[in-house]
């Protein structure tokens, strides 16, 4: 239904000028140039709703102008959102989930690694099973966790909790606004605390532990 609409899906629905459904069964394309396909990923039951939205893959769903869901069970919701792998989910304007099972929620959020979760405006995950929660938060290695505005956990199993907190070595933990843990296995607890040596522990506001095993 619509000028130059092209419906190829068995039991499918095609509504909108130049909207099109591929050969997969039960596909739905609604909106100007909305498109479902099974050319790249294959499968049935794709859904694309919105101007130039696109869905390809078994059960893939794209909602919003230029939303793109490419992967089995991928879900993209929001203008220019992208879910580009199996079971990936992207919610929000320009949100992007580009790895298997990844989840991105928030304007410009980006989940780039398998099973990672990025929540918040411009939050980013780049490590497998990592978590970033908060505006501009960043989790850059496997199992890293960053919680808070601008929190940054860039090493394997590192943890940064608090606005501007940073954990930059393997197993390091920084808890508190602007706390920094930059030694392997180090821990910094408290506002602006710093632990910069291996296994160092800094506890309290502005505390500083700069030698190995220091407390």
Language-model regions: role of each:
Residues 1-215:
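Glycine- and small/polar-enriched repetitive beta-structure motifs of secreted/surface proteins
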């Amino acid at each position: 239904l619509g000028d130059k609409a092209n419906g190829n899906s068995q039991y499918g629905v095609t509504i909108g000028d130049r909207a099109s459904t591929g050969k997969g069964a039960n596909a739905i394309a609604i909106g100007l140039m909305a498109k479902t396909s099974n050319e790249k990923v294959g499968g049935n039951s794709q859904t694309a709703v919105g101007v130039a939205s696109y869905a390809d893959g078994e059960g893939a769903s794209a909602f919003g102008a230029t939303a793109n869901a490419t992967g089995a069970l991928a879900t993209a919701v929001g203008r220019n959102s992208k879910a580009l792998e199996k079971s990936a989910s992207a919610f929000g304007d320009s949100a992007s989930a580009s790895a298997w099972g990844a989840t991105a929620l928030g304007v410009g959020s980006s989940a780039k690694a398998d099973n990672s979760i990025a929540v918040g405006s411009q939050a980013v995950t780049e490590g497998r099973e990592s978590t970033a929660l908060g505006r501009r938060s960043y989790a850059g290695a496997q199992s890293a966790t960053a919680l808070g505005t601008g929190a940054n956990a860039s090493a394997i199993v590192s943890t940064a909790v608090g606005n501007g907190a940073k954990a930059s070595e393997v197993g390091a933990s920084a808890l508190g606004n602007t706390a920094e843990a930059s030694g392997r296995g180090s821990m910094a607890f408290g506002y602006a605390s710093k632990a910069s040596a291996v296994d160092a522990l800094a506890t309290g506001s502005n505390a500083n532990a700069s030698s190995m095993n220091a407390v």
